[in-house]
Each structure stands twice: as C-alpha cells, then as structure tokens.
Amino acid sequence: MKQKKDYYEVLELSRDAKLDDIKKAYRRLSKKYHPDVCKEANADAKFKEVQEAFDVLSNTNKRAQYDQMGHNFNNQGFNSDFQGFQSANFEEFEDLFSSFFGRRKSNRHQEDIKGEDHHIKLTISFMESVLGTQKTVTFNVKENCEKCDGTGAKTKNDIRICNVCKGNGYISYTQQGWFVSVFGKQICPECGGNKKIYFRPECKFCKGVGMVKSEHKVTLNIPAGVESGMRLKSPNQGHQGPSGAPNGDLYVDINVQPHKTFQRKGNDIFSSILINFYQAALGTIINVDTIHGNVQLKIPAGTQTDTKFRLKNKGVPYVNSPFSIGDHYVIVKIYTPQNLSNTQKKLFEQLEELEELNRKSKTNSSWF
C-alpha cells in the first residue's frame, strides 16, 4: 500500500505554520489542482490530497493528534470531525471558489450569478447619524460595453460558444467533505459567465474586456441610529452581471464625525452642563440641548458636582426600530468663581462664619 504523503508537505508548509498560512496554502493549491481548472492527469488525486491535508491541519484537535501520531491517528471520530467541518471547511469551500474568480460567487442560496459587489465609504455628521438623512453618492461601476454587447469582440463573427461551460456561463462542482457533499455552480473561468468567447480582433472600446466603467449616482436613505463601523446594503446597485445576470450590491461603510457637545454610548447620549455654586445650593431650572431640541431640566437644591440626570427617550433611536429610543444623561459640573471682588469676599466670609456656627451648633446638640 502506497505511503501517504506528509500533510505539511502536501500544503508546502513548515510544521509550525499558522492557521492563516494553512488557509492561504489550501486556497492556492486547491485552485491550482481543481479539476475544472487544472488539465494534469493526476489533478483530481492532488486536489483530494490537498483537501484531506487541509481538513486535518485546519482543525486544532486533529492537527495535535496528527503531530503526535502521524497518519496512524484516528480521523473518523464523529463529534470532532463534524464540528471541525462546519466551523472551518465549509466556509473554506466558499472562499476557495470565490478566489478562483476574484469575487464571491457561491450560490448555496441562489442559482443566479450576480455582478460584483461595490464598496464605498461614507462620512456623515453626528446629527445626520442620530436623526437619519439622505445622501447622494457618485461612484464608478462596470457595465457591459454597448459597442460589443459585452462580448469583447470586434464583430459578431468573432464570437464562439465557450467550450468549457458549453454556453451555460457557469461550471458545476462537487466538493466532498467528511459527512456532506457540497454541490454548486460557479462562474465559468474561461468566458467569465458571458457564455461565449471571442477571437481577435477585439473591441476597441473595451479592449476586449466586454465591460466599461460608467459613473453611477445613487440616493441613499441613511436610517436614524447608525454609527461608525456599520455597513449598509443597497441591493442591485453594484457592478452589472454577465449576460443579463443581476447586478451586484452596493455596500456602504459608515463613518460618523464626532460632535463638540454630545457623546454617544450605544443609544444613549451624554453631555455636561456648567452651573455656579449658588444654583447648585439653591436649585434652579436650566435649558439643556438634546438631539431632539431644547428641554428644561430641574436642578434640585444641594446638587453636587458630577451628579447625573436622566432625560428619558431623548437619546438615539435604534436602527430600524424608531419607536425604541435611548436616553440622554446630563452630568452637572459646578463652577467655582475666580477673581472675587471685595464685596464678594466679604459675603463668602460671612457664609463661612454661618457655616461654622451651624457646625458647632450641631456638635453641641449631639451631646444631649
């Protein structure tokens, strides 16, 4: 019986390789030896060998057993194998085939081959993020060349049916796992999903690519409550799909500018107000700015610095749930006056004397 090749040698890795290195090697070699791409006679065997090596080395438990026992370790355990397959391999199948064609084309949930998705970054103000807004963005997308109808050929006589996908625009694949087989369709690497290929001369407008860049303008509805790091999706606003397939989607990464007064934590707003010592001692009513407008806040007598007051439902709406709103918290800061006049100093001295008398009175009364 033929001795199995060392799994590290199969993936062309050292024995201290990191998981990211293992994944990169798997994608590279799987792409290289995939039967639909590689024409070598033993491509199928090498492809399975790469898959087997990855299945073991990408799983922490299996790898540890393999490092100790080599090919003698038991690779048939149900619990660990099934869990490892779901957490790593199944996702890697999708990543593998997306790497073949430069973009994700998995159709486990749909049969159509879509155009590429487009990603942009959008910076908005703090108030726009908490209240919602509309933004018009302009960007370039790839569309079928009108001159050659997306074929890339100079004339229709230069076009032939693709002999790889037989005019289907996609190729089928079957990926064997330990307990499941993955079936799917991927865009044809030969014709790029156009179902046809051309022979020179090429279209002079698109240089044989079949697609040209076109300026695209979209008005986006930004919901109230978004924050930095959120990604919004605008369906069918990405690059045009091949041969009439749906467009890709537009993904918008949100960046929110900071506000000079308000700070946001989750869906709550925090701000500070400055009052003087006699307002804190006697109590007062002050006006407070919120994202929803100006409101009055009652400051009770004897308020101390850093006291926090809650304004219910004056915070940020939850995204896609406008009836759920956070709160606004107001933190009080007490101002100590400087550069006192002689009159003010005398008044403070009188207050100090009264405070001292009051303290002594309380001390004496405690003896009875």
Swiss-Prot record:
One of its GO terms (cellular component) is cytoplasm. Its cofactor is Zn(2+). Residues 6-70 form the J domain. Zn(2+) 1 binds at residues 145, 148, 203, 206. A zinc finger (CR-type) spans 132-215. Homodimer. Participates actively in the response to hyperosmotic and heat shock by preventing the aggregation of stress-denatured proteins and by disaggregating proteins, also in an autonomous, DnaK-independent fashion. Unfolded proteins bind initially to DnaJ; upon interaction with the DnaJ-bound protein, DnaK hydrolyzes its bound ATP, resulting in the formation of a stable complex. GrpE releases ADP from DnaK; ATP binding to DnaK triggers the release of the substrate protein, thus completing the reaction cycle. It comes from the Bacteria. GO terms for biological process: chaperone cofactor-dependent protein refolding; DNA replication; protein refolding; response to heat. It is found in: Cytoplasm. Zn(2+) 2 binds at residues 162, 165, 188, 191. CXXCXGXG motif repeats lie at residues 145-152, 162-169, 188-195, 203-210. Gene3D superfamilies: DnaJ domain, Heat shock protein DnaJ, cysteine-rich domain, Urease metallochaperone UreE, N-terminal domain. Belongs to the DnaJ family. Binds 2 Zn(2+) ions per monomer. It holds the Pfam family DnaJ. One of its GO terms (molecular function) is zinc ion binding. The J domain is necessary and sufficient to stimulate DnaK ATPase activity. Zinc center 1 plays an important role in the autonomous, DnaK-independent chaperone activity of DnaJ. Zinc center 2 is essential for interaction with DnaK and for DnaJ activity. This is Chaperone protein DnaJ. SMART domains: DnaJ (SM00271).
